[in-house]
């Protein structure tokens, strides 16, 4: 019987191969199927991740059962990951259900407390064979539970990153280099601090952390065609702006092994459903419009896997 995997091997291959694995936020069956169908078509490993509010919305047992079904159906390497775990209780709940990877987000605590709390999570998770992602430096924007205004967003300090990894034993690190959560990422021109990313990687390498995987949060491109479709069919999404795909591609070719996307899936799903409602006002079978949403999510994720993550054929 196929079962879920951790991200350990995935990230080793991704680092060596200069690509990244997509981590897609899931909330329901159609999103799971859209993402996994895309990964299967591209023969790519994939991370399905669940935020605290997704746990509340769908229930951990339903989400786990659907993801198990995806593994059984596709035979792909799939990791089930807790995104932005706010506390050790949530981490423990997810590990008990069978998640293979957890993120503890202590970035809103002061540094020493973040270290202490993260280490506690790492010790518990590792004793259960589960890998841990942590975050250092705050990302601006809004995503589910996470709200940080741009003025309070800080870039990750490279020396602190090394100290943090040393003292906590985390398996991967989410850093702040200019991305932000939500659909409104940049008011001006999009900029990512690649020099900072390189410095963090070099310093980790020098400290004995070989090929240490870096994670990029808030990395939706905010696809214009989805926004246009939403607005054409009655939506009001103004001024949305994401991270250009070519910047993400560059990050994936460096130490970034995991790129998180949530907003893009939300927009695609909403665009497909609005279009369906607009074009077929007489229809009322949810399988019609939910099926359209699943199909558009698959197309979007296939494009991401091919052109942004470059993780096509990573199952080989």
Model-derived segments and spans:
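Alpha/beta enzyme core
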Residues: 5-13, 28-54, 60-77, 85-213, ...
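Generic N-terminal amphipathic, Lys/Arg-enriched alpha-helix
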Residues: 6-22, 283-284
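Short catalytic/ligand-gating loop segments at beta-alpha or beta-beta junctions
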Residues: 216-221
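C-terminal alpha-helical cap/extension of soluble enzyme domains
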Residues: 232, 243-316
């Amino acid at each position: 019987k196929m079962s879920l995997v951790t991200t350990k091997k995935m990230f080793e291959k991704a680092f060596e191969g200069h690509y990244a694995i997509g981590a897609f936020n899931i909330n329901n069956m159609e999103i799971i199927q859209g993402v996994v169908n895309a990964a299967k078509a591209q023969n790519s490993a994939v991370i399905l991740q669940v935020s605290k509010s997704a746990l509340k919305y769908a229930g951990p047992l339903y989400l786990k059962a659907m993801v198990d079904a995806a593994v059984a159906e596709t035979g792909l390497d799939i990791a089930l990951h807790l995104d932005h775990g706010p506390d050790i209780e949530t981490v423990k709940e997810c590990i008990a259900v069978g998640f293979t990877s957890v993120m503890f987000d202590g970035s809103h605590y002061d540094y020493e407390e973040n270290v202490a709390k993260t280490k506690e999570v790492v010790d518990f998770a590792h004793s259960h064979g589960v890998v841990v992602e942590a975050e250092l430096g705050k990302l601006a924007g809004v995503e589910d539970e996470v709200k940080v205004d741009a003025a309070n967003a800080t870039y990750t300090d490279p020396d602190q990153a090394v100290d943090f990894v040393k003292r906590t034993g985390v398996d991967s690190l989410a850093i702040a280099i200019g991305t932000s959560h939500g659909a409104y990422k940049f008011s001006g021109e999009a900029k990512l601090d690649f020099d900072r990313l390189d410095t963090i990687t070099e310093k980790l390498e020098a400290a004995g952390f070989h090929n240490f995987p870096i994670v990029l949060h808030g990395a939706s491109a905010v696809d214009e065609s989805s926004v246009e479709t939403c607005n054409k069919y009655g939506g009001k999404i103004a001024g949305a702006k994401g991270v250009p795909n070519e910047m993400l591609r560059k990050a994936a070719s460096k130490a970034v092994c995991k790129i998180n996307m949530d907003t893009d899936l939300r927009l695609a799903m909403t665009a497909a459903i609005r279009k369906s409602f607009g074009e077929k006002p007489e229809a009322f079978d949810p399988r019609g419009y939910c099926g359209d949403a699943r199909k558009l999510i698959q197309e979007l994720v296939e494009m991401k896997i091919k052109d942004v993550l470059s993780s096509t054929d990573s199952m080989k």
